[in-house]
Every structure is written in structure tokens, then in C-alpha cells.
């Protein structure tokens, strides 16, 4: 049998080495799985966070609550180029620029705007990506899961933390 095609595919698609059955286990839906993920996480980068001037918006008050719950929040805003700190923390413009490891990337982007961030997420290699309530992009989720990253979609981190008593 010729293995040329397999070799070429492995070179072209290095992030898709996980079998179909395996990557689906990284799509987290169950409360117990979310609880386990949150219990073993401390550092959460918030992609699409908004500054204090937008305190009435979920992209600000959810990360603020997350910080109050004891997590380290790392702001990664998409807009607001003049803002240098949010929630008292230095701002990073790309996930790959954040020093150290990231446990969870909490995403506040419209579903159609998630795919352009996937390469940055993959370069940083967080343990998990959490897409907020109303945010679901199955193609991005599959790509992340195939790379070994756990994915939560369409769930509010604040609501889940409150519901779980964490």
C-alpha cells in the first residue's frame, strides 16, 4: 500500500492528528465536565474583553465576576487600541503575547468572528476555550478539539460559576 497520501496529509494538516472519535470527547457540554475544567483552572484570558467604560456589557462584567471568583483574568481586547489596562491588569493584543500558560480562553466574539482567532489560540495552546452564551462556531470548535483543546460553546461563564457555587 502506498502511504504517500497519508504522509502528505500529515505534513499539510499537522493539527488534525486526533481521530474523529477522540476529538469529540473534547467538546464539553455536561455540568460535571465544566465543573472539573473550572476547578483545575486559574488563569483565564478574555478575548474580546471590553474596558470599564463598557461596564454594563457582558464582555466587561463577566470577566469582572470571574476575577472576583478568584481567577486571574488576562485582558485581550480586540478593539480599544488606547486602553492599556482593564480590571487593573495589563492588556495584551494577541494571546500568543501573554506570558506563561493559559488555562482557559474565554471568547467574547460574534460566532463568525471566531475563526480568525483560531491560529492565535492554537499558537498559545490553552487547556480550553470557552465561548460565551450565544457564541457557537462548530468549525472552529472542531479545529480546536482536534488540536487537543477542550471546548465549551454557548455557555455563560458567570452563570455556570454561580450555578456551580465556584
Tell where the protein language model's regions lie, with residue ranges.
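Extracellular/secretory pathway and lumenal proteins
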Residues: 6-8, 160
